[in-house]
């Protein structure tokens, strides 16, 4: 199964992010926007894993989740990967993300012991859309600039989740396989 580790966001943040997606629109670029219910912070993309690996990963996530307290983060600003001259991914940023970064680093280290490839430079973000091609670079850049410091609200990081991703012609369908609550 195709899987990843994520943090879900609350409904009000989802509403704000969907408004941003609508504002960005599709006039200046062909963008595959992430569905409302699929908006999340990816801590680690795993790719194809077996049932056995899923069980090992669950054990690791349970231990890690117990070490961290529930905390609030702010979703603010719009950024792009890899850079403004070549926009492939549009994302919303996370402020005060130190704890998320720490969790991601620990997940990375623990999963490396199971043979998962280490990725460097974790940036906590919520992917809003993937750019297929740009029709009007200046227009798109201007829209993104207007949202550069936009406040999309706050939410409480209260759990980490192991999610399954099933690819369909209409886009991926995510299913939560296991949810691990952070400590109070």
From Swiss-Prot:
Keyword Transcription tagged: no
Top EC group: hydrolase
Annotated EC: 3.1.4.58
GO terms for MF: 2',3'-cyclic-nucleotide 3'-phosphodiesterase activity; RNA 2',3'-cyclic 3'-phosphodiesterase activity
Catalysed transformations (reactions): a 3'-end 2',3'-cyclophospho-ribonucleotide-RNA + H2O = a 3'-end 2'-phospho-ribonucleotide-RNA + H(+)
Motif (HXTX 1): 40-43
Keyword set, alphabetical order: Hydrolase
Annotated SUPFAM superfamilies: LigT-like
A Pfam family: LigT_PEase
Active site, renumbered: 40 (proton donor), 125 (proton acceptor)
InterPro entries: Cyclic_Pdiesterase, Phosphoesterase_HXTX, RNA_CPDase
Keyword Hydrolase among UniProt keywords: yes
UniProt superkingdom: Archaea
Sequence motif HXTX 2, residues: 125-128
Job of this protein: Hydrolyzes RNA 2',3'-cyclic phosphodiester to an RNA 2'-phosphomonoester.
Protein family (similarity comment): Belongs to the 2H phosphoesterase superfamily. ThpR family.
Identification of the protein by name: RNA 2',3'-cyclic phosphodiesterase
Organism: Pyrococcus horikoshii (strain ATCC 700860 / DSM 12428 / JCM 9974 / NBRC 100139 / OT-3)
């Amino acid at each position: 199964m195709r899987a990843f580790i994520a943090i879900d966001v609350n409904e009000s943040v989802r509403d704000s992010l969907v408004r941003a997606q609508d504002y960005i629109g599709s006039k200046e670029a062909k963008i595959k926007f992430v569905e409302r219910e699929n908006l999340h912070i990816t801590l680690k993309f795993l790719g194809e894993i077996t049932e056995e690996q899923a069980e090992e990963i669950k054990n690791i996530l349970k231990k890690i989740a117990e070490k961290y307290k529930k905390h609030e983060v702010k979703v603010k600003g719009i950024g792009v990967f890899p850079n403004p001259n070549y926009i492939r991914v549009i994302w919303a940023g996370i402020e005060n993300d130190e704890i998320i970064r720490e969790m991601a680093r620990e997940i990375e280290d623990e999963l490396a012991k199971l043979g998962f490839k280490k990725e460097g430079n974790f940036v906590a973000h919520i992917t809003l859309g993937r750019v297929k091609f740009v029709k009007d670079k200046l227009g798109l850049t201007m829209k993104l600039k207007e949202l550069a410091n936009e406040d999309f609200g706050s939410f409480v990081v209260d759990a980490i989740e192991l999610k399954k991703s099933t690819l369909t012609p209409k886009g991926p369908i995510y299913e939560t396989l296991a949810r691990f609550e952070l400590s109070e």
